[in-house]
Amino acid sequence: MFSIFNSPCVFEQLPSFSQPLHSRYFDCSSPVSYYPECKRRKAIKANLRAPKKSDANCSEPLRYALAETPNGYTLSLSKRIPYELFSKYVNEKLGELKENHYRPTYHVVQDFFGNQYYVEDEADEDALLRSALKDLDFRAIGKKIAKDLFQDYEIELNHRGDELSILSKKDKIFKEFSLDQVFEDVFVIGCGVENIDDGSREKYALLKIGLVKHEEEISEGGINEPKMPIIESKIDESHDDVNMSESLKEEEAEKAKEPLTKEDQIKKWIEEERLMQEESRKSEQEKAAKEDEERQKKEKEARLKARKESLINKQKTKRSQQKKLQNSKSLPISEIEASNKNNNSNSGSAESDNESINSDSDTTLDFSVSGNTLKKHASPLLEDVEDEEVDRYNESLSRSPKGNSIIEEI
């Protein structure tokens, strides 16, 4: 194939451009050195703090609880989980779920010389996080945390069966329990987080240990109890079925009274613990559902109350505005009536004054403006009076020549 580096058109060595990996733009000036960038997606990190010196020396205190069961005793060991450790496990699980849910998509990019590359599209991290949160199992995370915290614990029952010892080098714990009874074996029932469902910040890892009673102590009750005698009846076809059913029931009762093996006892114990955990989980879920329902009911009542108060306040403001409008409309009417009364009194005094005045004009108009009203006042007509000046003017007018002032040609 034709290589650009060996082309006769190129006389100088091409410069090498160092393009950083985090560059997101195509540089047209350096087509030869262009290559697809490495895809960097957002990672989930826990807010880890620097460990203090005091944390390295001191460990979390261990709590003990002993409960009696029909098969023996249950010893519960619990210790507090640091919040940083819990958030670390949760973030790691979220990262795994995000990687499992991530489905990459690509688009084709072409460079200056026509070379095509597949470039990964940018993923929607928020959508991936939401999908991962839906599949997040806190119980599995709690079980893993408890398993890691109690990993180095050594639980041992002595040969006599009356003393139990617990040893942990990591937590610097060595505890011996003196037992009042003789136990045959010890086993681990299960582990997990005690308060995984509630939203409290304090979480406690829980390890349950089962102590199996000795077979003689378990079978004591069965040996002392007298067995029911088998009723012998005559050989009769009508009573054969009844006798067979009774004998089967007695055999089942005898089998139930027989002591269970150690494996069967452990299986039964674990199953009972699982059922108890399921019942407690259901009761907690029902309690949480009731609390949620009550909270929603209270919020609904509060919203209705607030809406009712807002409507009442709106009605009050509307009424007050209407009253203000009515008062503003009634005020000008009263003011106009008062001004009319004042104008009437002023007009009466003006008429009396105008009657006493004798002027040369025939008619005089008196306009008085007071307030918002305008009224016209007319003076009384005066008698016609002969004027001497007018007579002299008319007489001189009659004596004036009536010809043209232009001299006619002779």
Curated annotation (Swiss-Prot):
Domain of life per record: Eukaryota
One CC-aspect GO term: late endosome
MF-aspect GO terms: protein sequestering activity; protein-folding chaperone binding; SNARE binding
Keyword field contains Ubl conjugation: no
Region (Disordered): 223-264, 276-410
Principal location listed in the UniProt entry: cytoplasm
Keywords, alphabetical: Coiled coil, Cytoplasm, Endosome
Quaternary data: Interacts with RHB1, IST2, TDA3 and YIF1.
Reported function: V-SNARE binding protein that facilitates specific protein retrieval from a late endosome to the Golgi. Modulates the rate of arginine uptake. Involved in pH homeostasis. Required for the correct localization of IST2. May be involved in ion homeostasis together with IST2.
Designated name of the protein: Protein BTN2
Originating organism: Saccharomyces cerevisiae (strain ATCC 204508 / S288c)
Lineage: Eukaryota, Fungi, Dikarya, Ascomycota, Saccharomycotina
Gene name of this polypeptide: BTN2
